[in-house]
A protein has these predicted regions:
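Bacterial Sec-dependent N-terminal signal peptides
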Residues: 1-19
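Short, surface-exposed beta-strand/strand-loop-strand elements in extracellular ectodomains
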Residues: 393-402, 584-596
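Aromatic-lined ligand-binding clefts that engage carbohydrates, nucleic acids, or primary amines
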Residues: 452, 573-588, 622
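Accessory carbohydrate-binding/adhesion or oligomerization-edge regions at the termini
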Residues: 316-332, 337, 469-542, 624-655
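Carbohydrate-active catalytic/glycan-binding domains of CAZyme proteins
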Residues: 18-477
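Short edge beta-strand/loop segments characteristic of extracellular beta-sandwich folds
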Residues: 383-387, 565, 578
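Solvent-exposed beta-strand/loop surfaces of large extracellular or lumenal domains
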Residues: 407-427, 589-611
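Noncatalytic modules at the cell exterior or secretory-pathway interfaces
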Residues: 442-453, 614-626
Length: 655
């Protein structure tokens, strides 16, 4: 009975990832990348932690996922496409689903994979067939006869034939059905220790560096065939390559594509693909399992050819490829370059997929992250996840460690206590991860590079940063007059940048305390030099906290002055001011106090009501002062008539 595989499950979009590794919720190794329908499809093996009864220090793979992306940044997991316990010829508990490949031919997608057979020894190579690159795939009941080995790769050559490579560089032509070796496939006897085997195909790595060679990947470029493969040069694998004019050789060795992993990770395995006129190298490394090199993860780098057709050696990076949108989370710990004192480590050594952190140990330390697209940012602010052992400052700059400042962040690890406050109330945030926000002093244009620098006397660790567009709480007022909205709420306000007040709790907002405080500030108002802004609120209430946040001013422990000008064509008698505020507030109409909202209160419409008032013909000035400690300050105000109906027959101006 034919079995249909698990890609019938719903595809799962992953987080936008423009850093290495690119798959961040599971291990992935031995990546084969192919371009189908103008999209990159990634067919890796799937490392897992060995279950009980399996060898704990060896590779363990039970199934295959397929992933795809249009930009090498946003990856979709299409789910499991083949599993060891559903292939008729595979030993169901072998956990040997090693490096695969997938090609398109004759209107079908052919997925090639190795595994341990139920009968015999070693590895066989099977084929599963689908109508779509993500499946569902249906496996053939038997493996390809004549192949005993691992790591299949299929080349569709310009001569019209398909060739399959496997193991330590063996190669044979496939029949047009893509499921059998060609009838004229040569056979040779091969010695392995004291044993002699008869093997199909030709050995394309003969007379080339091939110690413990495996994982061949072959492609064609400018009339040359490139046989690329991992082999052990000293103690761990490198990626080497050879060139030929014939798919089956002979090949001439040309050098390295990638040297040994610096941390001693034993294996590397790869594929090379051209996508949108750029060549890419897909490979693996044990980033998410640094103490276990049998659990690997896929990484990507750009690859370049020299004029003579040779390949420039690729250096692995943490940054990888792809452009990050500024409004997406940027794992800045996967930086492009850094000062020599910067280190990187896993943020969580138990759940390693929680990613990494970059440690910038002292003043002057920096990390640089290339290719961030700011075109999506209109009215933005910064969010950063960071920690420090002591109070310090970090800056976000453009292009270099001395570049233009985008944002400034204060990390307050050890807040100072107000005078007279007992030490027992001190809150210590030393070495605790804090998610902080900061306004932008400057917004780059288009695609640019980010640099994080330490400007304070203590070092800091950074996990991620993200830019966000502010909701449209308000906009600069126009020169034309406005009216209250249908419910009578005044939306145009003139606001002075907030002043700091030493208020840690709103419980002190008694009537007497507020009256004294507001009256003191009123006498100072003519001498205040704060900047004024005239804004139209998008909502019935003016969000003072967001106003302060946007312009980089005092957000908590704040005192706000707010006013608006009401222009009446005639006297409007017997109206009441109905107002609300988050925090305490005091209201004046034409210089006379009309309402006090005391205590620690939330903003509710019509929370307080004045006595009856008259809006006189001509110009009326409504002024408000709001004070708040730890809350999100805002206010609302309207006038209502004797029946409680909103008054709307006046204009609101800024003149």
């Amino acid at each position: 009975m034919k079995r249909i595989y698990l890609s019938l499950l719903m595809s799962v979009p992953l987080l936008s990832i423009a850093q290495n590794p690119v798959i961040r919720d599971q291990f992935s190794a031995d990546p084969t990348a192919r371009v189908f329908n103008n999209r990159v499809y990634l067919y890796p093996s799937h490392d897992i932690l060995p279950p009980d009864g399996q060898r704990q220090d060896w590779f363990c793979m039970e199934d295959y996922h397929v992933f795809s992306s249009e930009n090498l940044t946003d990856w979709t997991d299409h789910g499991v496409i083949v599993s060891q316990n559903q292939v008729p010829w595979v030993k169901p508990d072998s956990y040997s689903m090693w490096a695969p490949d997938c090609v398109y031919r004759n209107g079908k997608y052919y997925f090639y994979f190795p595994s341990a057979p139920k009968q015999g020894f070693g590895f066989g190579v099977g084929v599963a067939i689908a109508d779509n690159p993500e499946g569902p795939f249906i496996p053939e009941p038997e493996p390809i006869k004549g192949i005993n080995g691992i790591d299949p790769c299929v080349l569709q050559a310009s001569d019209g034939n398909a060739y399959i490579f496997w193991g330590a560089g063996r190669c044979a032509k496939l029949k047009p059905n893509m499921k059998e070796l060609a009838d004229d496939t040569p056979t040779e006897k091969v010695k392995w220790g004291m044993r002699e085997f008869e093997m199909k195909g030709v050995n394309c790595l003969k007379d080339l560096p091939n110690r413990q060679a495996e994982g061949p990947f072959v492609f064609e470029h400018n009339g040359n065939y490139y046989l690329t493969y991992p082999y052990v040069r000293e103690n761990t694998e490198v990626l080497g390559y050879a060139i030929s004019k014939n798919p089956m050789g002979p090949y001439e060795y040309k050098g390295l594509i990638m040297s040994e992993h610096v941390n001693g990770c034993w294996t590397n395995h790869h594929s090379i693909v051209n996508y949108k006129d750029q060549w890419y190298l897909f490979y693996h490394h044990n980033d998410f399992s640094p103490r276990d090199d049998k659990r690997r993860s896929v990484c990507i780098e750009k690859l370049y050819f020299n004029a003579d057709g040779t390949i420039q050696e690729v250096k692995p990076t943490m940054r990888g490829v792809g452009i990050n949108k500024a409004t997406e989370k940027i794992e800045i710990d996967r930086y492009s370059s850094a000062s020599s004192d910067v280190t990187t480590e896993l943020k969580d050594t138990v759940n390693t997929f929680r990613s990494f952190q970059a440690n910038l140990p002292s003043k002057g330390s920096w990390i640089k992250y290339n290719d961030v697209d700011f075109s999506c940012l209109t009215d933005g602010y910064l969010i950063i996840n960071a920690k420090a052992s002591d109070n310090t400052k970090i800056y976000i700059r453009e292009k270099s460690a001395k570049g233009k400042i985008i944002a400034k962040i204060d990390i307050t690890a050890k807040p100072e206590l107000p005078a007279g406050m007992p030490a027992m109330f001190r809150r210590d945030f030393s070495n605790q991860w804090l998610t902080l926000t900061a306004p932008l002093e400057y917004t780059p244009k288009g695609v640019s590079d980010l640099v994080v620098t330490v400007e304070g006397n203590a070092g800091a660790s950074v996990d991620w940063i993200q830019f966000k567009n502010r909701p449209k709480y308000f906009s600069p007022a126009t020169a034309t007059e406005a009216k209250p909205d249908e419910q009578g709420f005044i939306r145009r306000w003139r606001l002075m940048e907030p002043m700091a007040v030493d208020v840690r709790s709103n419980v002190i907002f008694t009537n007497s305390w507020l009256s004294k405080k507001f009256d003191e500030e009123l006498t100072k108002l003519p001498r205040q030099k704060g900047k004024w802004y005239v804004l139209d609120s998008k909502n019935y209430n003016m969000k003072l906290f967001r106003f302060a946040e946007k312009y980089g001013k005092q957000t908590y422990g704040s005192f706000f002055w707010c006013e608006t000008i009401i222009d009446c064509e005639e006297d409007i008698d017997n109206v009441r001011l109905a107002a609300g505020s988050n925090g305490a507030s005091k209201w004046w109409l034409n210089g006379e106090e009309v309402l006090l909202l005391e205590g620690d209160r939330r903003m509710v419409e019509d929370d307080g009501m004045s006595n009856r008032l008259t809006l006189k013909k001509g110009r009326n000035i409504l002024r408000c002062a709001v004070i708040n400690g730890p809350g999100l300050s805002d206010l609302c105000a309207r006038f209502v008539d004797e029946k409680g109906n909103p008054v709307t027959n006046y204009n609101v101006t800024i003149k």
